[in-house]
Amino acid sequence: MKGVKNEIDKRVREAAATLDITQYLDRKPKALSGGQRQRVAIGRAIVREPKVLLMDEPLSNLDAKLRNQMRAEIIKLRQKINTTFMYVTHDQTEAMTFGDRIVIMKDGVIQQSGTPQELFDHPANLFVAGFIGVPQMNFFDAELVKKDGKYAVALGGIEVVLSEDKQAKLVAKGVEAQAITLGVRPEHIFLKGEQMLKGTVDVSEMMGSAVHLHMNVMSKDAVIIVQTIDLQGSVGERFRYGNEVAFSFGGNECHVFDKDGKNLEF
């Protein structure tokens, strides 16, 4: 029994050292902060040396500052111990930062699985596209047109020819011209280009290195991220409420979804 007790004590102290909570071992739970209690709970699991560590929304009850701190702590922990983590969350930031692979579910049905980059760059449907990315992807009513064997998206009086990679995928799928939902991420929109859409500013958020423009575009809400280093003059004057802003995006940044929300490249 003594050997077992010594082994348990050894594991407890190793886990405490890993989580930097050795100084709290003699404290009662009520004397610990929320973040400290979370680390103690994780330590209890580590002591058992599990092959798989399941975490079910462990940060959901923490405030924003503590949540960010604990997110970094869990990432460090993953780097220290050789254990598979299964992490359940509704927070896409946690999913993107923690996961080597992400499984996105809706109503108990798997929508898509892959690396964070794969899901961000190639969402299988509208649900995944809207879930991954902050701010979320913009969606517009548009038409997929096909002229001389080339695909383009048409909206607001302009046509944007899709990239060669997207062309090849649509050709391989035998996709026909049709009404679509066009998805474009806020960071893939630019205030320059040959063919420009126009919208009006509802809200301008100065974030320091970037400005987030919340706009009305063809009666749809849209967000554009503009890097302040690319701007000249007063941001406040240029992006006042009601001001018109012209913008464009490239064919490689277009995500085309059919009437059922499926990405036509899949």
Q: Which residues does each PLM region occupy?
A:
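Residues at helix C-cap/C′ positions in short coil/turn segments immediately following an alpha-helix
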Residues: I81, P135-Q136, G193
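ABC ATPase nucleotide-binding domains
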Residues: M1-F131
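Glycine-centered loop/turn positions within well-structured domains
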Residues: T93, Q117, L126, N138, ...
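C-terminal boundary and immediately downstream tail of ABC-type ATPase nucleotide-binding domains
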Residues: H122-K147
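Glycine-centered flexibility sites
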Residues: G34-G35, G43, G108, G114, ...
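Non-catalytic connector elements of ABC transporters
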Residues: K147-F266
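Generic alpha-helical hydrophobic packing signal
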Residues: R11, A15, I75, I110, ...
